[in-house]
Amino acid sequence: VTDGEFRRDWWHIDFLHGFDGVELSTGDIYGEAKFQGTHEQPPTMMVAGRIRRSKPSMLEHFKFLKSVVRKGLPKFTMPSPAMLHARADRASLKKVYPDVNELWADLTQCYREEIAELYHAGCRYLQIDDTTIAMWGDPKVQEQFRKLGDDPQKDAEMYTAAVNAAIRDVPDDMTVAIHTCRGNFKSAWVAEGGYEPVAEAMFSSGVDAFFMEFDSERAGGFAPLRYVPKGKKVVLGLVSSKTAQLESKDELKKRIEQAARHAPLENLCLSPQCGFSSTHHGNKLSHDEQWRKLERVVDVARQVWR
């Protein structure tokens, strides 16, 4: 059970802005790596100083969630540390951190401190949301980051290493999952392309489960699942949170069968491909349509894994 991120305007920016050294601007830094079909884009994160955690970023959010959950396990979501490197103004970042390794040292330390406090507050299920690694399957996005002087393959490895550093002190009784997609804003997305180019790097993450976007052809096929480490869970995001059309049970079962050719069925799960409202704007579907989709997920899961 999550809080739906109701206290956040933006699923990622609000959390990172809670750290010292991260400020916001209205400047346009996204170039071609923008959400398709909308002129509105997220605000720009600027790195104004060394990143520190002088106070909790969202500890109170979790405490509220835990106080109202009567049945089920409270799950807290936070953006991957990669989101700052990928989506912040690169000039401001390099000015403060000429050595990117120092950025990761400071940023992942903030994450470890936040996660430790969440754990002590009772959090036992953490989801890290990442819209960077999956985008490297899109040649246009790769080219955009090459213009910044990046090597997309090395970035994928670096971002996975950052996640591993952030969760390295997590106790054994805390489940950590990572959700990867290609952007979710007002039913729009940033990138297209499958997981194949980054599968090996992504699956080297030390998390317990991978939530993966597979709701449309732009997400590619299931073949990259052959790289999933033994015993790790894969949650197939087959139900779109971007459109109102309700997926048929037969089609969902068919796609689960296809995925099971590359990873054991007992290690697979089913979910929507992303959140229904990753920002305060929401997506282009009604509350009722949202609930029908969630019911469809539950019904199909019960039939497949009964």
Q: Where in the sequence are the language-model features?
A:
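Domain-level signal for soluble alpha/beta catalytic cores
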Residues: 1-306
